[in-house]
Amino acid sequence: MIFIASATMGLESVVKEECLALGFKNIKVFDGRVEFEGDFKDLVKANIYLRCSDRVFIKMAEFKALSYEELFQNVKAIEWQDFIDENGEFPISWVSSVKSKLYSKSDIQRISKKAIVEKLKEKYKREIFLENRALYSIKIQCHKDIFIVMLDSSGEALTKRGYRAVKRLAPIKETLAAALVYLSKWKPDEVLLDAMCGTGTIAIEAAMIARNIAPGANRNFAAEKWSVIDEKLWTDIRDEAFSNEDLSKELKIYASDIDEKSIEVAKENAEKAGVEEDIIFEVKDFKDIESPAKYGAVIVNPPYGERLMNDEDIEELYRDFGKFCKKNLAKWSYYIITSYEDFEKAFGKVATKNRKLYNGGIKCYYYQYFGDRKNGYRN
């Protein structure tokens, strides 16, 4: 089987590295997705272990269609009965069509649904399907007349780890937060600071990475209710994930924010994630932070225009943050994600490198400043 790990634009290479680390085979990278081959064990592992992917799909088919009749026949040719139970719910929950002859999303959805029903009629010898049991959500995307039909095994997006208690303003997705940590090359024996932590997502994801806590071990997935996958697979891989957790390391992760309520929520989130003892939370303006070490890494998702503040406030904030870093964290490495176009000017320093990413649909750049000891922040 071919599986698809979807990815936010800009994070495909990070998801690829995760897939390689999990031992998946024949990995291929495309815009917005990473494909790999495997069996149901790999599908379960992908859902439980991937930190930066949004969802995991089974790739049911890829074909060219220039007419609705071609679309119908190609969708009907898929062996749906091998996956969908007799009373399973099989909505076509998402359709996209770009630069294609067949562009009507509603027509693509209607024709494809009809094709699936006709296929299942042949298998189950019935005219009506109740669709009141396990969920088999179907996604169809078409680009330049090439259709990809996918079956969603995740259900809720993988960013839903299960630890976020209360949403505050403009939270960063857990999948993106984990990617920021990976891209920083931070190591668990190094100091980490998030000086504008909000509800603590970056610090929590860093602690989970350091502890090797699988992000999906404590949540459920749509495919757990599919009869085609042995329940024991889910149990065994979860047990494996729990046994692989590393509680031996002493972590030095610091997270602070000027908003007291955000820190309260951050502590609740950390407790739910099982890392409350690994992070030192403080209610504090970043200007008042004293350096916890000579070397370290700062990873922040500060407020920016489309989300929380106007340009004048943002420029002042970034200018002050640049001064703070230069004065208090002179030998540290800094990693800042923002959509503000003039960030480097306001911060007062040109980044060593930057990377285009998307945060909640907003185009951002991840500015990376390598410190004196970018390959090791040990003190």
Where are the regions that the model predicts?
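C-terminal catalytic and target-recognition region of SAM-dependent MTase-like enzymes
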Residues: 285-288, 292-379
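SAM-dependent Rossmann-like transferase core, predominantly class I methyltransferases
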Residues: 149-183
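A short, flexible beta-alpha/helix-coil linker loop
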Residues: 97-100, 157, 303-307
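Short, charged/polar, Gly/Pro-enriched secondary-structure boundary elements
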Residues: 41-48, 156-159, 375
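Conserved S-adenosyl-L-methionine
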Residues: 172-291, 306-307, 311-315
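Residue-level signal for inorganic ion chemistry
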Residues: 19, 92, 140, 301, ...
